[in-house]
Amino acid sequence: MDKRLIAERFAKARGTYDREARVQQQVAERMMRLVLQHTGGDAFRFRNVVEFGCGTGSYSSILLHTLKPETLLLNDLCPEMEECVENLPSAGGSPQAGPSAGGTVVRFRAGDAEELDFPTGTDLLTSCSTLQWFTDPAAFFARSHRFLKPGGILAFTTFGPSNMHEIRSLTGHGLDYLPLDEVRRLVASHFDVRYAAEEVVSLPFADPPSVLRHLKLTGVTGTEKRMWTRGRLQAFCEDYTRRFARPDGKVTLTYHPIYIIAQNKSL
């Protein structure tokens, strides 16, 4: 996993990500609903929140306005993402307001979440659409439970093996996505899993070039290094249309979100 290349691709896409990342936004909204549903419904129990892989801040904004925590630490691999989240309005209505202003203290910390130490005593460690980029999820889970207070919550989404299967089947390139059962097993070594589920979402596009444009503008081509020659692009588009066209002539791109909510076992 080339983390440098991943960071570079997402940094370049930060100005277009929010417009293009329709599925990721839907996933973030559902994640928040599930967190409340499976942790007792008390939005105000989460005083200290850490989000790793915050990106441009779409999920961060949901966390801020729904939970209204005292502190929100935002982390991302890309230092450039700080400019995307620095003006998030706080729960009190102003950017990065402190507790005395009735708002949330919002801080940003750049770095690889697989290597960073987050604050101990955290109530909620959470992320959307990030963990699929990790080199060693098992090691992260083994470390992350130490950052949570007893009974603290780990809540995240990732993607499963059917994610963007169209691209992988045609190019032979893609991430090695873990299936739901494997993700649940890894988490259960250190947490009590309260909720684990998956869904498959099929997005329609006018044509294969529109699919490639979508991927570029969201930055999710982070591991792809190939050069598109005219001949290779033409062959890709023809194969994509032949294999993945709908009756109405549009083509599809599949997303496979996985949702996990777990409680810290440590006492």
Residue ranges and their predicted role:
Residues 48-116:
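Class I SAM-dependent methyltransferase SAM/SAH-binding core
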Residues 22-46:
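Conserved alpha-helix/loop element of class I SAM-dependent methyltransferases that forms part
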Residues 149-210, 221-230:
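Conserved catalytic/acceptor-binding region of the Class I
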Residues 114-125:
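A short acidic, Gly/Pro-enriched loop at the edge of an enzyme's catalytic core
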Residues 1-16, 29:
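N-terminal, positively charged/glycine-rich alpha-helical extensions of SAM-dependent methyltransferases
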Residues 20, 56-58, 119, 178, ...:
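Conserved Class I S-adenosyl-L-methionine
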Residues 138-153:
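A short glycine-rich, Lys/Arg-flanked "PGG" loop and its adjoining helix->strand segment in the class I
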Residues 123-137:
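A short SAM/SAH-binding and catalytic strip from SAM-dependent methyltransferases
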